[in-house]
Each structure stands twice: as C-alpha cells, then as structure tokens.
Amino acid sequence: MIVAALLLAVQVIAQNPRLERLDPDTRSAVTIVVDSARGAGLPVEPLIQRALEGTSKGAAGARIVAAVRRLAADLGAARVALGTGASTPELEAGVAALRAGATPQVIAHLRDVRRPPLTIALSVLADLVASGVPADSAATAVLALAPKARDADLVEFRRAVEHDIALGAPPGAATSVRVNAGADFGNSSGSPGTVPRPRRP
C-alpha cells in the first residue's frame, strides 16, 4: 500500500511538479486526492492551487489536506448539480454558491432555466449572500432573473442591491425590491435607484 502510494505520488508530481513545494507527507496525501479527482473526471487545477495557496500561507499540512479534500468533495457536488458538461469556472462558481448556502436543487434549477455558461449567475448568487442577503432570498432572486437577464444585467443587479444595502436597506428587502423593479437594468446614468431607508426607532 505504501509503495503504491509512493508510485502514485511520483506520477502525479511528474505531471504537476509544483506539488514539490509541499512537504513529503502533505504532498503524498494531496496527490491521492488529486489523482482520485482526476479519475472521477473533476478538474484538478483548483485542487493544486488550493494546496499551493495553503503552503504559501504557511498552513499546517493537515489543514492543507483537509481543504483540498473539502474542495474535491464540493467540486463533485457542484458537478452533480450542474451536469457533466459544466466547465471548470462553472464548477468553481458552483462551489462558491454551495458554500454560500445554495442547495444543489437550486443550482440544478438554475441550470434548467438559464443557458450556459452559468458562471456569472452562480457568482452573483454567492456575492449576494456575502453581502448579507439570506441564501433563500438570493436564490429566489437569481432564479427569477436568470431566464432572461444577461450576465451584465445580473452583475448590475448585484451592484444595485449592494448599493441599497450600503444606504441602510435591509438585505432581503433590497433584493426583493430590485427583483420586482427589474433592477433598473436600463439605467444609463450608472446610478441605480434606491429603496427607502429604514426609519430609525
């Protein structure tokens, strides 16, 4: 078993010499994850980049391995939701959306209602949650806009919601109002309208 693992490590390192930056134990564990992901048809570059990011930040080997394993699992979950034809950027955006709180069912529904690529739509969903919008509200908004909105429209929608939140609007309310108003996609001034600020008690 040990010999097989060492041989596998040599093969993967030959294909990805950057892994030599890892200490031997970490490199061996990461190599197994990378090879397994490759065998499953998942992109391995994000895994390698995650490992290199960890070592560049001085993270402990165990944390690096755990992060790589988690990413591999999340990439697998994203591919199940998005389908085998999903690109690497779509899968990475899918991972971000899943980690933000979107369910696999939401991502699969998005795939059904919007033409690929879905990278921007998934990224907007994740960004909305990061801005404080509840995950279910963000998902509902993106799904409502996805069938007809262009990528640029979705980006503008996200900016408009973030703008309203910065002015004091509750994240959920800002999202709902923007969806109902069409997010002012055609506003040529570049200054989106705002939802009313909440009254101070």
Enumerate the language-model features and the residues they cover.
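Sec-dependent N-terminal signal peptides
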Residues: 2-11
